[in-house]
Amino acid sequence: MLETRGLVKVYPGPVTALNGIDLDVHPGMFGLLGPNGAGKTTFMKILAGLLEPTSGTVRLDGADILEHPESLWPRLGYLPQEFGFYPHLSGEAMLVHLLELKGVEAPGGLKKLAGDLLERVNLTFAAKRQVKGYSGGMRQRLGIAQALAGDPRLIIVDEPTAGLDPEERLRFYRLLSELAANRIVLLSTHIVEDVAVLCPRFAIIREGRLLALTSPSEARASIAGHMYEGTVPVEDLPKLRAERMVTQALLVEGRNRARIYDPSGAPPEGFVQVPVTLEDAYLVLMRLGTLPSRGKRAPMGSSGEDAPGAPAVGPFAAASVAPAR
């Protein structure tokens, strides 16, 4: 289990990037969702040993990785936003180099192990090609192979799908879902669909604070029955925004098609109730600062499983990951 307690990071200025993060993450896929500048990358860099916190503790399976960072390196896989590749090396040579740095030993040799990693991410055909000749999707897959080097206990994946086209994203989801067996995979993203497809549990972060710890089904249930959609003239949109929580508004043929959150049960004339999406719940939470209470929810700091039988959501539902058992 990964545990953080009272994690704070203050940059010169002062700028508080993290403000008391308490979180327990169990084996399986766990998401950290929030807007740009929320503190996600700072959090990930601290976990990866690339940044020292101002205060707080981080433990992996009971061991304090801030006190003994050397104990983390062999057990860590890290897929950062910006890949750390040597462009002149081949994909195979890049992996061999990383395996050597990690002190990995393999009966068949490191080249064979590197080949096995490339095969796992469908890059065997490009094993001898220089990394500078890889496409964006190929670089993403090589990054996964790097993260898997040494069979790590903890894999940190920071903003993995930014810039990927839909086909590459679906392929990436499938690859990432395979990593979650018997290890902790921590995914940070600002894309709601990423957590909807991959994460049985996730936390929502804003301005360095955790606003909620939830699951896709819990988040949707928190606003169920309170989302409405309708059209309004362009000139009436400011009045609607003043009176209701408008989460989305799209201009269509001279009128605004608006989506609103209205717990009063008395929506404006012409608005009809619509099914709730995870994006709806996320947008409402970002406005309210908390999820509306709809019964018992898991306490902050716990990252257990989603409710049994929770429906898959999003256009990539076929790639959804079952909670780790």
Regions found by a protein language model. Give the residues of each.
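Residues that cap or initiate secondary-structure elements
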Residues: 15, 29-31, 236-238, 264-266
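Short, well-ordered coil/turn elements that cap or connect secondary structure elements
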Residues: 107, 180, 243, 266-268
